[in-house]
A protein has these predicted regions:
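Surface/interface-facing alpha-helical segments and adjacent flexible terminal/loop regions used
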Residues: 1-104
Length: 104
């Protein structure tokens, strides 16, 4: 879940910072969301392994790595992670990720 969280956040950060999207980013977002949902789903017991709070904490933990990767990719690598962080709202990105994962 952590690894897919990094990929999901990476593309949401790029979308927010660059104020645009690509088909490739959209596909990566959909794939990451699906993989997180599958990994977190309990088949036999029905329900999830991680609560909403635990999942949010995992995404918050993954955010810094996603931001570092996004700094390399967004704007062709012109910004350092610190500079890029000023262009986006961490809370909003994590909220969007949670809404996608929980299908809200």
């Amino acid at each position: 879940i952590f690894s897919y969280g990094i990929i999901l956040l990476l593309h949401l950060i790029k979308q927010s910072a660059e104020n645009r999207t690509t088909r490739s980013w959209n596909l990566s977002i959909r794939n990451s969301v699906k993989q997180i949902q599958r990994s977190n789903s309990r088949e036999k017991a029905k329900g999830t392994y991680m609560s909403e709070t635990e999942l949010a904490a995992t995404l918050e933990d993954a955010y810094d790595l996603a931001l570092e990767k996004a700094a390399i990719e967004a704007f062709e690598g012109q910004y350092e992670a610190e500079e890029l962080s000023k262009l986006v709202q961490q809370e909003e990105i994590i909220k969007k990720a949670m809404n996608l994962i929980w299908e809200r």
